[in-house]
Regions:
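Conserved active-site and SAM-binding loop architecture
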Residues: 1-191
Length: 191
């Protein structure tokens, strides 16, 4: 399969597909940190989304995709999309950054590809686009951590947990300013 892993400089997902024998390429505006420049496209992913394109990997080798990608996996930046940062727009943060991030996300959702997975935390895309097909947790896949991760899928099945472990510890953060507390409840941050 020809696989495009968008917004991935670490190459972890790309390497997993390569290990299974697929022609996978990571693409990010940053240099790759995974040690395989021959699999990394450093640049804008948007001209590549619909396939039928030529590109150069970070090692200088030219490649081409004659048809559509068989699979696109995208990790668009969540800075302006996640719920945790939405308060900043009420404090004067440029709202256009949010709209640009939504538009970027939607480029992946609307790409000419039969199989697409878009990953992002809980945020505005649940209302701006649609609810995710699935919300997963690291502890369902062998990592003792809690972090709700949304998956928007096209043509793909839901992920099945492969190694359920303890959810990990949580840290309780208490807002000590009574005026800001709602019904004197603590705010809990889990990870």
């Amino acid at each position: 399969m020809d696989v495009l892993i968008a917004c991935e400089e670490s190459q972890r997902v790309c390497a997993a597909f390569r290990e299974k024998g697929h022609d996978a390429f990571s693409c990010d505006i940053q240099e790759c940190s995974g040690g395989h420049p021959e699999w990394h496209i450093q640049g804008d992913v948007l001209p590549l989304l619909d396939g039928r394109c030529e590109f150069k990997t970070a090692d200088g080798t030219r490649h081409s995709i004659s048809d559509r990608w068989d699979l696109i996996i995208a990790h668009p930046p969540c800075t302006h999309l996640s719920s945790s940062g939405q308060w900043a727009y009420k404090k004067g943060k440029d709202i256009n950054l949010k709209y640009e991030a939504i538009e970027f996300f939607m480029k992946f959702a609307n790409a000419d590809c039969k199989y697409i997975a878009i990953e992002n935390p809980i945020g505005v895309m649940s209302t701006e686009y649609r609810k995710p097909n699935q919300i997963i947790q690291p502890w369902q896949f062998g990592h003792k951590a809690q972090k709700s991760t949304c998956l928007w899928l096209k043509g793909l099945p839901l992920l099945t947990p492969t190694n359920i472990v303890d959810k990990g510890e949580f840290v309780e953060w208490i807002d000590k300013k009574p005026a800001k507390r709602k019904d004197k409840q603590s705010m809990i941050l889990r990870f």
